[in-house]
């Protein structure tokens, strides 16, 4: 999925904006400010919506206005560029919001002490526009593999799901070498876990998908084994199948656990609050946010799985799964 980048500038600098769009190429989806304002909406409403939809932003500060300050003539960027930088910076954080300034542009003193990329219009220089944009591209690639806590919940959901379920289930099976099916303990020779991430979420989250998926693949419900001698212990429920299906369950068997994280349903409710709509029909912005959250959930989960010996090599994450 391509990342979205909002690009803002003054109306006089559309040539530079379009050059940046060309330099970024087809690896990302650029949203110039000229395409960001919806009809019958205020400019502020449209900008706030873009802070929620864009993964990154680039604001271009150029020498647009000549002002006098304490008797000194200064060349300053347009006010809207400074405002939009603050808006996106507050929404996404400094790792995802870039201000690039033309050389000798007088910036607000609030930015003193912050490294701002300053470009020249002269090609061939160390800080020519193409080199500045390339440095941003490099940084985007670097942070693309990382996840951050944001206004939407996928990172926190993945951490909670891993710690409270995936890791615990693996630790329990490693320790007890058994599972419980209808009160009967089945010895486990080996196991693997597939976490199933649906391609899309419906209005019921993953509830209906889970029911149909388990039915289609003939999965049985079981739990991890409990120790009656230990008060307060409980079995962790999951769906599984025996490989092969006709294996003698009186002997240790290979089991295949499959789980569709019910916590993904939280994403649906969060998106309704995050980007409310009073229309019926397909909402491409909502679809994009949903895809972004599912992708991020899977990315965080894979990272956590790979860092623990109890889960690494035992748990796979299946993405974009269809019925």
From Swiss-Prot:
Changing residue 52 to E: 1000-fold decrease of NAD(+) cleavage, binds c-di-GMP, does not form filaments. GO terms for biological process: defense response to virus. It comes from the Bacteria. Changing residue 290 to K: No NAD(+) cleavage, binds c-di-GMP, does not form filaments. 3',3'-c-di-GMP binds at residues 164-165, 234, 237, 259, 262-263. It is an enzyme of class 3 (hydrolase). Residues 154-323 are annotated as: STING domain. Residues 4-120 form the TIR domain. The active site is at 84. Forms homodimers which subsequently form filaments. In vitro in the presence of c-di-GMP forms filaments up to 300 nm in length with an ordered array of parallel-stacked subunits, where the TIR domains form one face of the filament and the STING domains form the other face. Antiparallel double-filament structures are also seen. 3'3'-cGAMP weakly induces filament formation, while 2'3'-cGAMP does not. This is CD-NTase-associated protein 12. The gene is cap12.
């Amino acid at each position: 999925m391509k990342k979205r980048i909002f690009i803002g500038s003054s109306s006089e600098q559309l040539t530079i904006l379009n050059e940046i769009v060309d330099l970024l190429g087809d690896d990302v989806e650029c949203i110039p400010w000229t395409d960001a304002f919806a009809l019958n909406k205020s400019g502020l409403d449209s900008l706030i919506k873009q802070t929620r939809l864009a993964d990154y932003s680039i604001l271009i500060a150029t020498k647009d206005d000549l002002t006098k300050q304490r008797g000194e003539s200064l060349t300053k960027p347009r006010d809207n560029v400074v405002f939009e930088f603050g808006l996106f910076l507050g929404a996404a954080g400094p790792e995802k919001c870039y201000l690039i300034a033309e050389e000798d542009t007088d910036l607000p003193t609030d930015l003193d002490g912050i490294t701002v990329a300053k470009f020249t219009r002269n090609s061939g220089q160390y800080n020519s526009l193409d080199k500045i944009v390339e440095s941003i591209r490099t940084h985007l690639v670097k942070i693309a593999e990382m996840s951050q806590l944001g206004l939407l919940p996928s990172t926190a959901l993945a951490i909670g799901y891993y710690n409270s379920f995936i890791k615990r289930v693996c630790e329990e099976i490693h320790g007890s070498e058994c599972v419980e099916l209808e009160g009967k303990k089945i010895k486990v020779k080996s196991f693997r876990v597939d976490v199933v991430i649906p391609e899309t979420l419906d209005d019921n989250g993953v509830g209906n998908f889970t029911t149909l998926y388990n039915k289609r693949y003939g999965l049985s419900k079981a739990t991890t084994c409990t120790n009656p001698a230990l008060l307060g212990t409980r079995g962790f429920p999951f769906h599984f199948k025996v490989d092969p299906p006709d294996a003698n369950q009186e002997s240790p068997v290979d089991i295949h656990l499959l789980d569709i994280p019910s916590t993904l349903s939280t994403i649906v409710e969060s998106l309704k609050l995050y980007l409310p709509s009073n229309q019926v029909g397909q909402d491409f912005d909502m679809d994009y946010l949903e895809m972004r959250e599912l992708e991020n959930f899977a990315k965080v989960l894979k990272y956590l799985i790979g860092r623990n010996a109890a889960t690494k090599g035992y748990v796979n994450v299946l993405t974009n799964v269809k019925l």
